[in-house]
């Protein structure tokens, strides 16, 4: 059985003379937004608290971000703008033009959460979630980075056995703006038999594949040097092109070991043996599914950050969890995913790796000291609310000696 599961995994060694040829693929992509400048020490950050628990966790992350930055000589100018349901209530649209302008003019954007029961019956164009799609489009972010790390302090919170979950540390790099979610034609029509038919189109151009592949190769290079490209090349033409382009780029990254895996196998392998993965790159819909699957290995989506990057301009950083309207305003939310999103903002958005390391280390210290919000609580640890968890992380940022990279 195990052997059968591995049959569609293939390590690729590409001749040095075979390279992708699109103009876009010839430009190097650094895993950091173009606004990042190592010499710059003052940044404008647009905060989008959004709905539900969003304002609570963003407020805490802002304080941690500001403190970590100040210890490394970094200053921030914060601008808070409405999005989602909050914007609907305020001005009648999920993403006001003023919010778009502020986001574009900033160095990075930190988002809380979007949505809630209150707006569930709105028309499609007036749903809070529309604001998220619109801000992604406005910022032209195309690469979504989703880490899934099982921390030693939380290994027992995983849904998998300890021996399977322990040591998992992977990154899913998801293409964010192409594929079946955006392809045309799409719609619902009535066929010649009078039956309704729904249809969508999976479309990828070579340059779209090349640019996400470059982000993935660069990410893998900075991690453990292993990249697994996930597709469905045995069935889908779009995946055949995907595999071809990713393979072609491999020769430019001889220090990265490339393998390919079909998406159905990848879904099984993430549960069977997640430690085999370092960096995964895949298309929009596969990445949407696999990154959620990977997140559950960690035990709580309240721990997981994400980064969405563009070729140029500000990146969008947000926790992967939803707005959790059922616990909003009750001091029950886990702020760690948003705090870690702030760390990703520093690392990938601004290039401030020392300040980012301070935040990452502070989260570990708070967990080592036994503090837990309800979603990660277990016997023998101290149950705390959202605010107290934030305060503990803030104390840990303060107590650290200068961070090293």
Swiss-Prot record:
Pathway: Amino-acid biosynthesis; L-leucine biosynthesis; L-leucine from 3-methyl-2-oxobutanoate: step 3/4. Expressed at low levels in seedlings, cotyledons, hypocotyls, flowers, roots, pollen, leaves and stems. Regulated by a thiol-based redox modification. Its cofactor is Mg(2+); Mn(2+). NAD(+) binds at residues 114-129, 234, 265, 318-334. GO terms for molecular function: 3-isopropylmalate dehydrogenase activity; magnesium ion binding; NAD+ binding; protein homodimerization activity. Binds 1 Mg(2+) or Mn(2+) ion per subunit. InterPro entries: IsoCit/isopropylmalate_DH_CS, IsoPropMal-DH-like_dom, Isopropylmalate_DH. Its EC number is 1.1.1.85. Mg(2+) binds at residues 264, 288, 292. It catalyses: (2R,3S)-3-isopropylmalate + NAD(+) = 4-methyl-2-oxopentanoate + CO2 + NADH. SUPFAM superfamilies: Isocitrate/Isopropylmalate dehydrogenase-like. Substrate binds at residues 136, 146, 174, 264. The record marks 133 as: Confers substrate specificity. Residues 1-33 form a transit peptide. Changing residue 146 to K: Reduced activity toward 3-isopropylmalate. Homodimer. Involved in leucine biosynthesis; catalyzes the oxidative decarboxylation step in leucine biosynthesis (primary metabolism). Catalyzes the oxidation of 3-carboxy-2-hydroxy-4-methylpentanoate (3-isopropylmalate, 3-IPM) to 3-carboxy-4-methyl-2-oxopentanoate. The product decarboxylates to 4-methyl-2 oxopentanoate. Required during pollen development and involved in embryo sac development. This is 3-isopropylmalate dehydrogenase 2, chloroplastic. It comes from Arabidopsis thaliana. The gene is IMDH2.
């Amino acid at each position: 059985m195990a052997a059968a599961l591995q049959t569609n995994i293939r390590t690729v060694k590409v001749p040095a003379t075979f390279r992708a040829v699109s103009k876009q693929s010839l430009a190097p992509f650094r895993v950091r937004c173009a606004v990042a400048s190592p010499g710059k020490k003052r940044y404008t950050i647009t905060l989008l608290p959004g709905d539900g628990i969003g304002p609570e966790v963003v407020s805490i992350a802002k304080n941690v971000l500001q403190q970590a930055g100040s210890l490394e000589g970094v200053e921030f100018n914060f601008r808070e703008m409405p999005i989602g349901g909050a914007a609907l209530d305020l001005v009648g649209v999920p993403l006001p033009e003023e919010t778009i302008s502020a986001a574009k003019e900033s160095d990075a954007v930190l988002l809380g959460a979007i949505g809630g029961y209150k707006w569930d019956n709105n028309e499609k164009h007036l749903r809070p979630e529309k604001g998220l799609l619109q801000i992604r489009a406005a910022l032209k972010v195309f690469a979504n980075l989703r880490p899934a790390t099982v921390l030693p302090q939380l290994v027992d919170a995983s849904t998998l056995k300890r021996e399977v979950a322990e040591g998992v540390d992977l990154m899913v790099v998801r293409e964010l703006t192409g594929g079946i979610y955006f392809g045309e034609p799409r719609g619902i029509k009535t066929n010649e038999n009078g039956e309704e038919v729904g249809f969508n189109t999976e479309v990828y151009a070579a340059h779209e594949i090349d640019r996400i592949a470059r982000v993935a190769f660069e990410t893998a290079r900075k991690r453990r040097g292993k990249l697994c490209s996930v597709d469905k090349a045995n069935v889908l033409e779009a995946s055949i092109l995907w595999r071809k382009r990713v393979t072609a780029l491999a020769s430019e990254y001889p220090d990265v070991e490339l393998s390919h895996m079909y998406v159905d196998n990848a879904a099984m392998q993430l549960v069977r043996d997640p430690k085999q993965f370092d960096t995964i790159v895949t298309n929009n819909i596969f990445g949407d599914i696999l990154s959620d699957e990977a997140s559950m290995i960690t035990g709580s989506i309240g721990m997981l950050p994400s980064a969405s990057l563009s070729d140029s301009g500000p990146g969008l950083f947000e926790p992967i969890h939803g707005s959790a309207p059922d616990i909003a305003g009750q001091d029950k939310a886990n702020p760690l995913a948003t705090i870690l999103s702030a760390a990703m903002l520093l690392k990938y958005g601004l290039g401030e790796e020392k300040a980012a390391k301070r935040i990452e280390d502070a989260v570990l210290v708070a967990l080592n000291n036994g503090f837990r919000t309800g979603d990660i609580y277990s016997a023998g640890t101290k149950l705390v609310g959202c605010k107290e968890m934030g305060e503990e992380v803030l104390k840990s940022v303060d107590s650290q000696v200068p961070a090293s990279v």
